Amino acid sequence: MIKLIRTNSHIQYNYAQKKAYEVLLKYSDGVLPIDPFRIIKKINNIELKTYTEFAKELQKKHPSMSIEEIKCQFESDRGFLKKKGKKKYILCYNEEDSIYIIRWTIFHELGHYFLEHLKEEYSYIFCDGERYNEIKEKEANCFARHCSSPLPLALYMYVEINNNNLKLLDLFRYFFNMSKEVSEYCSNHFSTHWKYYIVEKNDNLITLF
């Protein structure tokens, strides 16, 4: 198995964005809002499970524990990605969350998958483990932001189609099916960095949708 080793503590925002657009071009069906469930179905080595489904599997090995007791041991209240053998993965999400949170969670965990965070070997340059985890979380969030609402497409829709009639926050909520919280997160980033997304290399992405 190839292990990736980080040589610095830089957050690879550009790489996460680039990878998100590559994933959309390869796996998306070009329909809005972008459906992470449909993307996962096209990835052969990821098994998608709810928290309850995964807890029931684990209960077979730990029959003395209840489903809820097992869930309490999960590393996150939202979702997580785990390796299963050498080449397969399990992506679990909390089915009790709203559909908005579930979608974001899956995009986020797909970020960990496509950015190969689970293949990384711990590097001693990260003496602070919290900093190392923070970097990976920010990269996964960056991937999720661009994969769930590709900003070159948002810019095109906002300027060319919408003609600025719809508020930016509402554009993210209605066209990309995001919660108010995530819409604010994406629209704030968009407002600050929108000029960065006016480039011809994104034409294929816009054409896809």
Where do the protein language model's features map onto the residues?
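Active-site hotspot residues in diverse enzymes, especially metal/ion-binding acidic/histidine motifs
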Residues: 1-209
